[in-house]
């Protein structure tokens, strides 16, 4: 059995998990998330804990039990606490402004770049050079943060661009004569 799948998922107070034949739904303060259940994994719920076991002894079922356990754990954490990703804009004149479900970026192009946020994702700008992406779905938060970063990734010579707050950019040395 997968080492990850051996650990049960603890369901905190205020979070409701329903396991149907083909769907796992997690409902909480942060919203509702659902996931298709894999036929290779048996999910059992008892005394506030979810347990995941492979349906058979195949390697694929073993691996899938650990994967499904971690996905459900991320859903439970997302609806109870939420996830956030911080980005910073480095460069002269680079700034961001959040207006409702849109993010406006001025990052050195001849035009401002507007990015629409999907439902369930909120974006804030505490300062003009910081962007915070929040949401209940860990995968979507990371995906939106990656799309924002892709507008102007950090360049290796001066480090200008959009980067994750905890990202370290290795600056290259310029060509010498």
Curated annotation (Swiss-Prot):
Part of the 50S ribosomal subunit. It comes from the Bacteria. GO terms for molecular function: rRNA binding; structural constituent of ribosome. The gene is rplF. NCBIfam families: L6_bact (TIGR03654). Transmembrane segments: none annotated. Keywords: Ribonucleoprotein, Ribosomal protein, RNA-binding, rRNA-binding. Belongs to the universal ribosomal protein uL6 family. This is Large ribosomal subunit protein uL6. It comes from Verminephrobacter eiseniae (strain EF01-2). GO terms for cellular component: cytosolic large ribosomal subunit. GO terms for biological process: cytoplasmic translation. It holds the Pfam family Ribosomal_L6. This protein binds to the 23S rRNA, and is important in its secondary structure. It is located near the subunit interface in the base of the L7/L12 stalk, and near the tRNA binding site of the peptidyltransferase center. The keyword RNA-binding applies.
């Amino acid at each position: 059995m997968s080492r990850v799948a051996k650990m049960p998922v603890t369901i905190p107070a205020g979070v409701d998990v329903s396991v149907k034949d083909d769907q796992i739904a997690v409902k909480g303060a942060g919203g509702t998330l659902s996931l298709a259940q894999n036929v290779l994994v048996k999910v059992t719920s008892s005394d506030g804990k979810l347990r995941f076991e492979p349906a058979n002894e195949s390697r694929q079922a073993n691996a899938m039990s650990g994967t499904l356990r971690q996905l459900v754990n991320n859903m439970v954490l997302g609806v109870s606490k939420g996830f956030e990703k911080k980005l910073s804009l480095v460069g002269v004149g680079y700034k961001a402004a959040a207006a409702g479900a849109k993010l406006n970026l001025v990052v050195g192009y001849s035009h401002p770049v507007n990015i629409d946020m999907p439902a369930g994702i909120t974006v804030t700008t505490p300062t003009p050079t910081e962007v915070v992406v929040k949401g209940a779905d860990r995968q979507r938060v990371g995906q939106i943060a990656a799309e924002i970063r892709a507008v102007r990734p950090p360049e290796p010579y001066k480090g200008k661009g959009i980067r994750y707050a905890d990202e370290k950019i290795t600056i290259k040395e310029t060509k010498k004569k």
